[in-house]
Amino acid sequence: SITSEFIPWNNNSHKKIIKALLVNTKNANTFTGKQGKESIDTIAKNLSRELTLKESKNQKGTKETVKIKDLIFASTGVIGEEFPMEKIKNSLPDLVVKLRSDQNKMYWIKIASAIMTTDTKPKLAYEEIIIGDELVRICGIAKGSGMIAPNLATMLSFIFTNADINSNLLKTLLKRAASNSFNAITVDSDQSTNDMVTIFSTRALKVGQNLSLNDKIIQKFELALKKLCLNLAKQVVVDGEGAKKFLT
């Protein structure tokens, strides 16, 4: 099947720990051939260097090396145009400098707005649950509008949680949540080349790495994740390109 150049990059990573996600809009990096593939390689090397340099100046904690295989990418935009590698590469130093660890609602709105293409509004969702005495947070953003069909299509969604859940289990939970949300919507029945939905854990809150689908903690988390994904999927449909009706 035909995909954007970032899809095989992400699939070949096989990393359970990802340290950075870079998203670009306006260019899908699809049907770009050798130039598109080499662009990702170049951007990855430069982003790796900039993030490692930032870590070397970190006064608050462990200084880590960020390798190119610690990175994943997403693209959305026009298909078949030359990928603007130089423009993106030259913007990386300033982009990395602006990275921050503290967050608020406006910060998330800015991120959701930055990935918009034909969307008319940013799409965000938030869920929280209590596990023991701890607050588990799940936050997600998405973009969509045109060409949304089952099995995703031109839709990107990035979900984040502080719960330190085993990566394989987290992947299973996301697949189950997506099956009745992102993979069950359509706007104009066309499928795209840049599908992506992913979930990240900051691992800040230890809930247990040896949990399974049968554990009540995981079942509680899964319900919240499914609710969040359905919320985002509905936002994508409601804001569909030219959409005037929402059928369920």
How should each PLM-predicted stretch be described?
Residues 49-52, 66-182:
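Glycine-rich, mobile lid/loop segments that gate access to catalytic sites or pores
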Residues 1-45, 72, 147-170:
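Glycine-rich phosphate/pyrophosphate-binding loop regions near the starts of catalytic domains
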Residues 2-12, 39-52, 171-184, 223-233:
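Short, well-ordered amphipathic alpha-helical segments that serve as non-catalytic structural scaffolds
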Residues 34-36, 80-88, 201-213:
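Short glycine/threonine-rich loop-to-helix capping motif typified by GTGT followed
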Residues 199-248:
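A glycine- and small/hydrophobic-rich beta-loop-beta segment
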